[in-house]
Amino acid sequence: MNNWNSITIKISREAGEAISALLIEAGSAGVEINDSADYLNHEDQFGEVLPEIEQSDFVEITAYYPENMPIVELKAEIEHKIANLSDYFSLTGLSVTTNNLSETNWAEAWKKYFEPARITHDLTIVPSWTEDYVATGSEKLIRLDPGMAFGTGTHPTTKMSLYALEQVLRGGETLLDVGTGSGVLSVAASYLGAAEIFAYDIDEVAVRVALENIELNPGHEKIHVSANNLLEGIDKKADVIVANILADILVLMTEDAFRLVKEEGYLIMSGIIADKADMVIASAEKAGFFLETRMIQGEWNCLIFKKTENREGVIGG
């Protein structure tokens, strides 16, 4: 019998991915995210009976830690780190609670909740331990270990990023993946024909996770992963830059992105809550980009900008 402590955080949905990363960094063996939007936005394709869920602006994130870790001190440390993030998102309604539980082989049992998920017409995310799933037709399998960090790749912001990559990649491109997290976007770009991919993350844990996930997939030799703060100090010119991170962070990189994107190239920005989309658009347009496509799923936005002198077909052009 394995004993575990859990820390559950209730916080605004916008902060969910950042808090998940923080909990993993603090040593969590796994993170569970309970989000009502996952049910409300779910497309019933297989006759599933889903529970009645009331819309909420909050998510509950539960992280699991071995019992021998000092949970009281750990809770205090996590609360301190969350407080330091108040400049980036609202902490209104925040709650942090702890619990003790016993579970036989918990580290394996949680895996039953993650199943293969068809994300786009051609891309399906498959847990690394699912060996019997066979691709059909043009389907390409992205293998991930979602227990390592950063979820399963099925969040609306990730889905829209994948759709955006399908829209702009034609083959042979150089791509920069900023805030790579699980590495899912880099793997997808490889499948979609990008010739050279550079993935960056400021978090060393994310760099390790991305490397491990990328190596689960074919074509990993053309993906280069390293620690870096956004695009600071990067000189590599790219046909496409993609970033799925917080809106307040995205606006810090628009000028560097414009410097690095080749003429007629694209900047894909996702992870944007609806009420901050205009802020991101203004920042990118000020840098010199034109908004070409705006995708919306629920309260999330994904924006595709183009660096071009020809405004025909561009929003506002």
Curated annotation (Swiss-Prot):
Its main location: cytoplasm. HAMAP family: Methyltr_PrmA. Disulfide bonds: none annotated. Belongs to the methyltransferase superfamily. PrmA family. InterPro entries: Ribosomal_L11_MeTrfase_PrmA, Ribosomal_PrmA_MeTrfase, SAM-dependent_MTases_sf. PANTHER family: ELECTRON TRANSFER FLAVOPROTEIN BETA SUBUNIT LYSINE METHYLTRANSFERASE. GO terms for biological process: methylation. It catalyses: L-lysyl-[protein] + 3 S-adenosyl-L-methionine = N(6),N(6),N(6)-trimethyl-L-lysyl-[protein] + 3 S-adenosyl-L-homocysteine + 3 H(+). This is Ribosomal protein L11 methyltransferase. Its EC number is 2.1.1.-. GO terms for cellular component: cytoplasm. Keywords: Cytoplasm, Methyltransferase, S-adenosyl-L-methionine, Transferase. One of its GO terms (molecular function) is protein-lysine N-methyltransferase activity. Gene3D superfamilies: Vaccinia Virus protein VP39. It is found in: Cytoplasm. Methylates ribosomal protein L11. It holds the Pfam family PrmA. S-adenosyl-L-methionine binds at T158, G179, D201, N244.
